[in-house]
């Protein structure tokens, strides 16, 4: 197996598959139907907030990853376990799933990731291996070849996308009159899933993806017509670490191309403003989790006066010092 084998397939999720995923996830107590605060006052605007920040493990990631395990071979899971690559929410979710299921979990993370994240994942029983960022994909591919582990990709897998689509179905259940659905985008798994659910359900809502200016692989992909890496070999520059993979997923991009109306970008300062506005509205969010709200508050969505706008709040996992900086007016050092 090579690193190129880790990319997702070209197939698109169907409505039946999305509904099947939602039904399957309802059988797991740890996959929560998260609250949606409709027409909530945030930063002087009325915004409907889909609080994936209240999902088990603190982010939306558990939806897709739980469904990936549901669809995987049980004997392989028992004998070999799972593997992922992540320094953040995906690694946290896979570590949790290893603990919850008893399957062996291994997480490869960039050598630059903070040690406390490694310790946190290890506390849940995961084996965590730090490698240089440019060698992550090769390390995971070698691990799969040698240990036969099931790959739980952080975003680029159609089963992951189908699982995340359950979030989109819930959004429509709670706001069938939504005019605009706004979703943060890193590799694109959540955006792909929510957009597929919204469009396949027949909703006329406009779906908008939001990326940091310093990590806009999906916007570059939309412009070029194929999944792209960030410039200079995948370099990113943003405080929104959860939205800064070096590349857009191929399976994710195929769904974005089919179901997303527009991808916009926001600055780090705009995400900090949104994080503060959410805090004042009673919602704790990591900076990445505030990106969709940032697009709304910064006027990146066009004329939405009088329209029902639903924004995902994708996660709450943030270090204390990062949160203090986000809530302050002081410039944040990169």
Regions found by a protein language model. Name each.
Residues 1-334:
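PLP-dependent amino-acid enzyme catalytic core
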